[in-house]
Every structure is written in structure tokens, then in C-alpha cells.
Amino acid sequence: MKAVILCGGLGTRFSEETKFKPKPMIKIGKFPILFHIMKIYEKHGINEFILALGYKGNVVRNFFNKENLIKLNNSYYKYIGKKKEPLKWNIQFCFSGLKTMTGGRLLRLKKYLKKEENFLLTYGDGLANVDINKLIKFHIKQKKIGTVTAVIPSARFGAIKLNGYNVSKFSEKPQSGEGWINGGFFIFKNEIFDF
């Protein structure tokens, strides 16, 4: 099964970072967000990716074409740390437009997904603790065209419980209780393109 990662947004809220690179290329530690997302999928046996490029898409391509990445038969091997463990990913790059919205980006990938009964999709700027294999099993069992992950968001701030004028408890960013939000990881049947 292939995983589509949308990497084309402008990232206006991170303008100091995204002036020179797309949001998926903002680093967390030594590697960009995009790399961490791909590692989530890899952990669950997914190593075929379609990267839907847009704004500053050349930065994404260049990351995978650096000296420390070797291209062999459309697969990329990256040696990390002292173990030098190869990461074998098959990556297709697709330019999906500079200002194209999410649905339009997905539609432009139709020809790359025509042989896939189901495919995974996520945004290139969000990380989550998602069990991809459970998501796939749930999707197949439900027999629906699409499955979206839903999460209860954390509150923006930590909470303090007061007992009179004394602090009795600190709660660091508890769940907000404001309802479910889009967790950013999806799986679709190919039939999605019939709508």
C-alpha cells in the first residue's frame, strides 16, 4: 500500500522558517518533519511514498538527493548513526501545484494511485502516535470509502487546580474536552476519485 504525503502548503504561520523551505522540511532534531512522518509509516511496514510537492518542492527533492542519500532503482538509502542501517523507501515526487487545495492535490495524484485498492494519506506537517496497521484493519473492516483519524486535542495551556489560595495540583496541558478534531492520518479506497 502506498502512502501519500501532502508537502505543498505555504506554511504561513511559520513564515520565519518557511520563507526558505516548505513546512514539512522544518527540522525536529536532526531531521525534517517529513522524515519523521515517513518513519512512522516505515515502522508499520509502509515504504512506498508519493510526495505531493508544491511550494518550495525543490527543497524536498534536494533533501532526498543529498550526498548522504544514494538513489538505487527509485529507492533511497539513508545511513543514520553509527549502525548505518539502510532505510529503503520507494519515493515518487509529484508536483501538485503552488496554490492547489487539498482535494485538488489529491485529484492530481489519481494516475499514480490507479492500481491501488486502498491508499494512505497524511499532511506533511503533522506528527501523531498513530497505529497505521490498526487504522488499515479498521478501514477494511468498516468497508467505507474513507477513514479519518480523530483525536481529542490537548488544551493550549497547562491547568492549575486551586484549593482556596493554594495550588493543589498542576496538570500539564490536559485534553481540552472540546470534542474531536482531525488527527491528520487517512486511508481511502480508490473509489474516492469517483466523487
Give the role of each language-model region:
Residues 1-62, 93:
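N-terminal glycine-rich phosphate-binding loop and ensuing alpha1 helix
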Residues 9, 55, 133, 190-191:
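Alpha-helix/helix-capping structural signal
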Residues 13, 63, 130, 170, ...:
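Residues that scaffold the ATP/ADP-binding catalytic core of kinase and kinase-like folds
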Residues 55, 122, 162, 187-188:
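A conserved hydrophobic position in a structured secondary element of the catalytic/binding core
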Residues 60-163:
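Conserved beta-loop-beta/alpha segment of the NTase-like Rossmann-fold superfamily
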Residues 162-178:
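Short, flexible, basic/aromatic active-site loop/helix in glycosyltransferases
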Residues 183-194:
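Conserved nucleotide-sugar donor-binding
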